[in-house]
């Protein structure tokens, strides 16, 4: 007796069933068709990508993803979540009458490729370009509808020419606070030359511009330029051989990449004066359609606070502090400066003053020794570590005393690592009775405290008896009077206003606004990044390259790695890879400034990996323009301000929430500079932001804590085993190193791309993280099989639809689905859209018999944004020769969307006595009549009188008896 394979027998009986093989053939064929026809090419209003006026005349929609870094590992199924979502949304927008721009480039500069090059000897460009090609293949297989003419990589010289050009616009600009905008630096020079603006001197006097040397002029302009080089404390990572921005350092003071120790070092670095835009970056958040959580992160990062600057005299120098509580000045009993404060050396005496407490000295013989030792200690901590609420407060007395400007008292001056040079002025007045950190510091160093805000509890006004500081605004000021001013009895708000006015009148301070935001550290000691278009003359003055010399291409070097050091050796400094190519570094150039050929030295730092992503939305608009950053008409068309979008920008930008204070803030800054200078009409880059969740996966670890291959783990009785050993399971990230990565290639091979697309969109709300389950993918595959069967005979391959009119029940199901799916796709609720499609498809399947053509065609159009390949195939089988991509999305007939009947509950004394099927449009008067006439209601009343009838048509009648 022979045995048969049921699956094989089934395929023989149904040779035209939708299978993985059929899906693969369909998908490859339609992807080729889309490429050949330019299906997703969005026309510009002008230029080389101009297209048909009819399409350009449609309302536009610019949809963007945060573009990927081309990793050597390729994509796992978590990566395409956002790409599929934007593709579904873009397809829906095309079908609802929009000219849709949707494309994808590659963010290709950065440390990973450089590290790979160091390890393998492969040039970063070679490995990066290979990774890009691999990723393009993976992305194409997903059926993403991108305009491929607009794609690029940030490593393309034609692209980074304009990154360099933008840098030069920023370098050659200054922020005019009166005009509240950036202006060309040439206009500032003209003001200096004419005498309209004075050139300040350190002693407060002024000088004429003509009296300044070239170096002095460069120094003056450096104080104004929006891109400038300066010596400043930076985060130096010897293990990486480069400096890091604050955002690239973890909370425990280590590098985000590589987990190396990070130290504070003083180095000359390029910075972007993003702080000039702090107010606008804050204020313009209100016009953006962004998640409130992201807005809050940006607001907190910018950190606007109102207060006063106050001068404390120390040995003939004025040390300025910023405080948000000038009303507590009488309570300032000591000062604390950042260890790096430049005035510390000036007022540190040779010996300890008489009577210095031992606890203040740190055990050192002299103030200079104490200061030097503490500075070295502080340099080993990151800003995050320094500001952490550590139990033990550290610091050291400088040996100097300052004068409290309101009380005239002498207060000791300390340095401590919890004060940062980059925030405020790098100095604070300490009011320990009313600040938690100051209180802890005062207790640790046996410093005096004075209560100047009356506690609202019963602790009294002697801080020496308190367990903690009293920090409240809802109280009155006490112990705050001198011969010249008294704040006693005032509320906090009134006291702040009075003391600020007094400080300004006396020339001791002024009201001001401070920001937590710091200028953006913009240089890296790496090879694989954009070269700076800057050269230095023999006097060390920085000069911009003329536009004709752009792009300044990255040269070949034999060794790509920055010089790295012992990760724990703080006494090191950077050596850049580019500095080793002397033929490239030392050049003779004619910069067109009238001086003729001169010898110069190129800048050997490179730009950070954020540079290329600060403006890429603009390059998508006009990707082949070699004369302008972007054609103004094209930028205005796609990104210009319009109703509901007063600052312009991309219509939808989808990406991870982890970029809240890095890429998103930097891109906003660049856009505002370009807007101010008249290069673009959009003051904001991204109008609407959507953060997708994360696709998670289970990580399995053995007894050593080492990840084991998830695919080889077995489940038995609720426990998990790998090669017979019990392992732990924890939900986390998906990745190659965690041995739990599933590639889209695997799923596409087993089920097809449309199934993968549906599964990722159906897993849950797009903005919520969710666990991957390969076993559940088959559910969406079966949905597509049922869809196929509703149109195609599996045995013959013939189309089975009929031209008959659908019945009432089918029409209602169809139009409810159309209405719901349309709303869900517009709102990016893709999981519920798929649920509605599934419900309609299942109803048609259960009904049996052939599906009416009008219903089948509408169903295919509903599916098209979600599963475009099978939709194209079925659309073609239904007799249409044109692509489904530009068909009109179905519109629901309101008559069929409203339920034919709804259930009305009738209550007597709050208890349900009857349920009635009534029209949803029934009036309250009619519903009351129907309810009172119902036999069950009549029986329940039993002849009792009715005091009141409460009607809420069409769903409730409540009868109150007499």
Curated annotation (Swiss-Prot):
Class of this enzyme: ligase
GO cellular component, one term: cytosol
GO biological process: leucyl-tRNA aminoacylation
Keyword Nucleus recorded: no
Motif ('HIGH' region): 68-79
Single GO molecular function: leucine-tRNA ligase activity
PROSITE patterns assigned to the protein according to its UniProt record, in alphabetical order: AA_TRNA_LIGASE_I (PS00178)
Residues involved in ATP binding: 736
EC numbers on record: 6.1.1.4
Ranges of biased composition (kind: Polar residues): 570-579
Family, per entry: Belongs to the class-I aminoacyl-tRNA synthetase family.
Protein name, per record: Leucine--tRNA ligase
Organism in which the protein naturally occurs: Streptomyces avermitilis (strain ATCC 31267 / DSM 46492 / JCM 5070 / NBRC 14893 / NCIMB 12804 / NRRL 8165 / MA-4680)
Source species taxonomy: Bacteria, Bacillati, Actinomycetota, Actinomycetes, Kitasatosporales
């Amino acid at each position: 007796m022979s045995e048969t394979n049921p699956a094989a027998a089934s395929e023989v009986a149904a040779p035209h069933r939708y299978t993985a093989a059929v899906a693969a053939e369909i998908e490859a064929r339609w992807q080729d068709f889309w490429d050949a026809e330019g299906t997703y090419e969005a026309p510009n209003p002008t230029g080389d990508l101009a297209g048909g006026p009819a399409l350009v005349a449609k309302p536009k929609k610019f949809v963007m993803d945060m573009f990927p870094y081309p990793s050597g590992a390729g994509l796992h199924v978590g990566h395409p979540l956002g790409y599929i979502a934007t593709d579904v949304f873009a397809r829906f927008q095309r079908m609802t009458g929009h000219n849709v721009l949707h494309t994808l480039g590659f963010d290709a500069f950065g440390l990973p490729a450089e590290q790979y090059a160091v390890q393998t000897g492969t040039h970063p460009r070679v490995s990066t370009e290979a990774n890009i090609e691999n990723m393009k293949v993976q992305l194409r297989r997903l059926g993403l509808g991108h305009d491929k003419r607009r794609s690029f990589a940030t490593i393309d010289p034609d692209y980074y020419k304009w990154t360099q050009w933008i840098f030069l616009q920023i370098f050659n600009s200054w922020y005019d606070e009166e005009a509240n905008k950036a202006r060309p630096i040439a206009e500032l020079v003209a003001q200096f030359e004419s005498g309209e603006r004075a050139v300040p001197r350190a002693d407060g006097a002024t000088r004429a511009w003509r009296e300044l040397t070239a170096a002095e002029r460069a120094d003056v302009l450096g104080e104004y330029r929006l891109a400038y080089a300066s010596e400043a404390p930076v985060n130096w990572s010897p293990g990486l051989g480069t400096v890091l921005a604050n955002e690239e350092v973890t909370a425990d003071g280590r590098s985000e990449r590589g987990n190396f120790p990070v130290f504070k070092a003083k180095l000359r670095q390029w910075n972007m004066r993003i702080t000039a835009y702090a107010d606008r970056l804050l204020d313009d958040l209100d016009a953006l359609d962004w998640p409130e959580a992201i807005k809050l992160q940006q607001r907190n990062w910018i950190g606007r606070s109102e207060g006063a600057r106050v001068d404390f005299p120390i040995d003939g120098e004025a040390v300025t502090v910023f405080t948000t509580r000038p009303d507590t000045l009488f309570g300032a009993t000591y000062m604390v400066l950042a260890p790096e404060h430049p005035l510390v050396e000036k007022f540190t005496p040779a010996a300890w003053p008489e009577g210095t407490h031992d606890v203040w000295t740190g055990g050192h013989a002299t103030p200079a020794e104490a200061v030097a030792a503490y500075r070295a200690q502080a340099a080993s901590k990151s800003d995050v570590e320094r500001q952490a609420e550590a139990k033990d407060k550290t610091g050291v007395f400088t040996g100097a005393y300052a004068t409290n400007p309101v009380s005239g008292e002498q207060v000791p001056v300390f340095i401590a690592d919890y004060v940062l040079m980059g925030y405020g002025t790098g100095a604070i007045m300490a009011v320990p009775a009313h600040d938690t950190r100051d209180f802890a510091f005062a207790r640790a160093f046996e410093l005096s405290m004075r209560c100047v805000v009356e506690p609202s509890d019963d602790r009294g006004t002697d801080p020496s008896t308190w367990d903690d500081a009293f920090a409240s605004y809802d109280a009155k000021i006490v112990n705050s009077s001198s011969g010249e001013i008294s704040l006693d009895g005032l509320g906090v708000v009134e006291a702040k206003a009075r003391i600020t006015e007094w400080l300004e009148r006396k020339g001791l301070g002024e009201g001001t606004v401070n920001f937590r935001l710091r200028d953006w550290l913009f240089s890296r000691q790496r090879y694989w990044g954009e070269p700076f278009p800057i050269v230095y003359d023999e006097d060390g003055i920085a000069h911009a390259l003329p536009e004709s010399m752009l792009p300044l291409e990255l040269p070949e070097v034999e060794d790509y790695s920055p010089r790295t050091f012992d990760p724990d050796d703080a006494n090191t400094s950077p050596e850049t890879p580019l500095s080793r190519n002397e033929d490239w570094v030392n050049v003779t150039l004619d910069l067109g400034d009238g001086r003729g050929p001169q010898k110069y030295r190129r800048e050997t730092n490179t730009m950070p990996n954020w540079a290329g992503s600060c403006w890429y939305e603009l390059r998508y608009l006009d990707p082949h323009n070699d004369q302008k950053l972007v054609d103004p008409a094209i930028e205005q068309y796609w990104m210009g301000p319009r109703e509901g979008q007063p600052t312009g920008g991309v219509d939808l930008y989808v990406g991870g929430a982890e970029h809240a204070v890095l890429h998103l803030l930097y891109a906003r800054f660049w856009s505002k500079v370009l807007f101010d200078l008249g290069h673009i009409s959009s003051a904001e880059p991204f109008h609407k932001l959507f953060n997708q969740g994360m696709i998670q996966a289970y990580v399995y670890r053995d007894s050593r804590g080492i990840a084991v291959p998830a695919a080889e783990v077995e489940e038995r009785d609720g426990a998990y085993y790998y090669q017979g050993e019990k392992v732990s399971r924890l939900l986390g990230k998906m990745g190659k190193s965690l041995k739990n990565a599933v590639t889209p290639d695997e799923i596409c091979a087993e089920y097809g791309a449309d199934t993968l697309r549906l599964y990722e969109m159906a897993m849950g709300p797009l903005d919520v993280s969710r666990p991957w389950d390969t076993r559940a993918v088959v559910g969406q595959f079966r949905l597509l099989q049922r869809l196929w069967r509703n149109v195609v005979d599996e045995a013959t391959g013939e189309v089975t639809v009929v031209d008959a009119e659908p019945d009432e029940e089918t029409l209602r199901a169809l139009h409810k689905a159309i209405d719901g799916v349309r709303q869900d796709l517009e709102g990016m609720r893709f999981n519920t859209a798929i649920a509605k499609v599934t419900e309609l498809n299942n109803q048609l399947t259960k009904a049996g018999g052939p599906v009416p053509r009008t219903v089948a065609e509408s169903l295919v159009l509903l599916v098209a944004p979600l599963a475009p390949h099978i939709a194209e195939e079925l659309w073609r089988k239904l007799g249409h020769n044109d692509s489904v991509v530009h068909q009109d999305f179905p519109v629901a007939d309101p008559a069929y969307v409203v339920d034919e009947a709804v259930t009305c509950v009738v209550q007597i004394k709050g208890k349900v006595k009857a349920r009635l099927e009534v029209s949803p449009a029934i009036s309250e008067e009619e519903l009351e009549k129907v309810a009172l006439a119902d036999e069950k209601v009549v029986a329940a009343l039993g002849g009792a009188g009715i005091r009141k009838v409460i009607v809420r048509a069409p769903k409730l009648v409540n009868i109150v008896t007499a």
